Curated annotation (Swiss-Prot):
The keyword Isomerase does not apply. GO terms for biological process: L-tryptophan biosynthetic process. It comes from Halobacterium salinarum (strain ATCC 700922 / JCM 11081 / NRC-1). It catalyses: 1-(2-carboxyphenylamino)-1-deoxy-D-ribulose 5-phosphate + H(+) = (1S,2R)-1-C-(indol-3-yl)glycerol 3-phosphate + CO2 + H2O. This is Indole-3-glycerol phosphate synthase. Pathway: Amino-acid biosynthesis; L-tryptophan biosynthesis; L-tryptophan from chorismate: step 4/5.
Amino acid sequence: MDDSSSLASPVQSILAAARRRDPPTRRCTVSARSLPAALHSAAADGRTPIIAEVKPTSPTTDTEHSGDPAELAREMVAGGAAAVSVLTEPHHFDGSTDALRAIRDAVDVPVLRKDFLLTEPQLDAVAADAVLLIARFLGDDLGDMLAAARDRGFQALVEVHSPRELARAVDADADIIGVNNRDLTALTVDLDTFGAVAPEAPADVTLVAESGIATPTDARTMRAAGADGLLVGSAIMDGPVRDTTRRLVTA
């Protein structure tokens, strides 16, 4: 299924924990708010289309963030975020499905569930407007997972890091693709990754730049390289949430 042999140790630990999670017993169905439409609307209004992420902590940082998740999300939207991403991975990111439920009730923008989903039943843990599917982890199962997500009403943001993974995502009929600037082998970030991968995507695919976007200059660089949306977590969580979101939105 997944290609994990060369992944960084923290990533291997995340995947091992994901495999051990008990699957939900009830199927989830969703009437989703459109993520591509929200990104397009933000751009049409002259805003940089930001997907702001509620991320309590991460294996790549020593920082921990407290605070009510729903209030954080409201602050992000007040700062102009087009959508909100929510970590639901409990063991390494301190995320929860309860936080996502509260956030989706609190805001009227699309909410992305960011987690490490390896099997179809894991899709059923919580209703969200979109789910993250990581091409490298799913391997040959990507197409089946994408179809299963859509069958439940989810949109899927398919994450890639290389032209090869992009080709697999396109072959699986992904229509929202995120290019992760973070190399999951070394956990290093290179903002040039997006510019190297994105030009190979079909014109009708919604492209999202992920990881390492910290400043208005970074945001402008990603937009100039073709990003339809920018997923930003740590840079927003590490500062005054509303003000930091607004600085990126107005880049």
